[in-house]
Amino acid sequence: MLPLYLVHVLYPIGLIANLFFGSAFTIQWLLSEKRKTAYVPKAFWVLSSIGAVMMIAHGFIQSQFPMALLHGANLVIYFRNLNIASSYKLSLTTTLVILVLTLLVTTLPFALAAYYYPYMEWMASPNFFHLPLPPPNIYWHIVGCLGLFTFSSRFFIQWCYLEMNNHSTLPALFWQAGFVGGFLAFIYFIRTGDPVNILSYGCGLLPSLANLRIIYKKSRLPKFHSPSCFLSAGEPSGDTLGSDLLRNIKELNPNIHCFGVGGPLMRKEGLEPLIRMEEFQVSGFLEVFCAVFSLYKKYRKLYKAILKENPETVFCIDFPDFHFFLIRKLRKCGYRGKIIHYVCPSIWAWRPNRKKILEKHLDTLLLILPFEKEIFKDSPLKTIYLGHPLVKTIANFQDCNAWKQQLEISDQPSVALFPGSRPGDIFRNLQVQARAFRSSSLAKSHQLLVSSCNPKYDKKILELLDKEGCHNNKIVPSKFRYQLMRDCDCALAKCGTIVLEAALNQTPTIVTCLLRPFDTFLAKYIFKIFIPAYSLPNIITGSVIFPEFIGGKHDFSPEEVAAAIDILANPIGKEKQKYACQQLLKTMTENVITPKECLQAIYAQKNRFYLKNDFIKEFHPKSSRA
């Protein structure tokens, strides 16, 4: 279609196009090797699209109609893979129309050229180096056509997988068709003396072989020991979540073997403990640093046990830093089962890069806070909002009217203190809270009731209160904390889950959190954690429900906390907080998925054998024979 000298001058366009194809497959191969599984990054489709446009131009210039037609069709498929994950996803019908139009536009110039130039070849053999090659016979052309057809069919195979699964991937059949078709085309272009296509199809054999090798190695991994699942919770709050999750799993399959890390609640539900949760009780940067070798030994024990048992599902509940190491190690070692993380790390507060780790390694993320769904709205990671378990716990809580009589506490009005659950937190925060109470207007009219998580700390708590001049006081065991919240006039609580419990019990509350000097330094100057609010009620509502006093000893004083107590002594301030707590509850109970529905979503389709038959029928009516 073009003058011969121009055809030769523009011939390198095909070579440049193959550099883009080569780069696309090289990136795909390297990332697949790193992840130990066939993986397709977005860059693969972008680079392939650029290469396809250049190969279409190369086909026009060199009068190679099949080449232009093939890459025209492939260009539409590349576009579809990029489009399917976007917010402007086109329908399948629209995509098919684009494909037909592309093929027509590609064919039209060749048809016009053939009409005006009857001797034009539709598949010219360039023989760029002028080798003394005789024209290939019909059998060579059959080999070439068969190779090109098989090779080109791989992206149509991929397209079918894409539309069926709504997910961009390159299945094993894609690589098998690519290898067989590429090998036949490679032989054919050697015979015709076409260096661009020799390079293209010759180099194209390498990614196919590399990915088939990865797929073969993956298929040789041991099968799942089913039914079994691993659960890990390193904190008391995680133990509560894990016990509820474990109860639902056991209801669906009573014979499932559940093992891992858990506290007394999870062990009560049938967890076989590899390590007890109590062995993970560390808090703050300094305590974690001192326990790093012990944590490393536990980490090694756990990932080795998981790889040996090979459960189908791994549930990591909260405790993100430890679990992230475990999750990455499992994927690196080729673990193929589902990994679900229960409770999103506070990426909205600090270290937002952890979102990429979640997207890379997890199958599902279970959320307990309503605003977290918005964070992942454009993410490929599947998220399920279960709601916060405290909502249900507090709603079902039955008051014990005689709790004061049991503890020999008078009916005098009270202020409640919740200094924390760990020893370091308790004594740092209790001192600030006691001084604030003593400086407030309620000190003479109210008694001081302190919630204690562990009886072994009670003696030291009473000694500290006496030292601070708070003599009208009593210790209240943690199991009575909800009665305490509902009975007291106001509460001072250490920043944490206890603040959300207070809000759901509609308790007027002030948040305090006195940090160690070292933790304060790291938070301010190393990790630079500066957010509008730190307690969950304030974060969820986006407003200041509870006043917050958080930081080092120079960031706030007991007198400032006392001023906040005096505001809550006013009925107007108290009612304002209670109304805000009611709105918080409404926000937290919208669009919640039940645990049973959650497990159905996790174990959908290929994992149906995990569930009891009645559950299969309930959620998979077409598969009742499974």
Swiss-Prot record:
Transmembrane segments: none annotated. One of its GO terms (cellular component) is membrane. NCBIfam families: lpxB (TIGR00215), PRK01021.1 (NF002173). One of its GO terms (molecular function) is lipid-A-disaccharide synthase activity. Its EC number is 2.4.1.182. This is Lipid-A-disaccharide synthase. Condensation of UDP-2,3-diacylglucosamine and 2,3-diacylglucosamine-1-phosphate to form lipid A disaccharide, a precursor of lipid A, a phosphorylated glycolipid that anchors the lipopolysaccharide to the outer membrane of the cell. The lineage of its organism: Bacteria, Pseudomonadati, Chlamydiota, Chlamydiia, Chlamydiales.
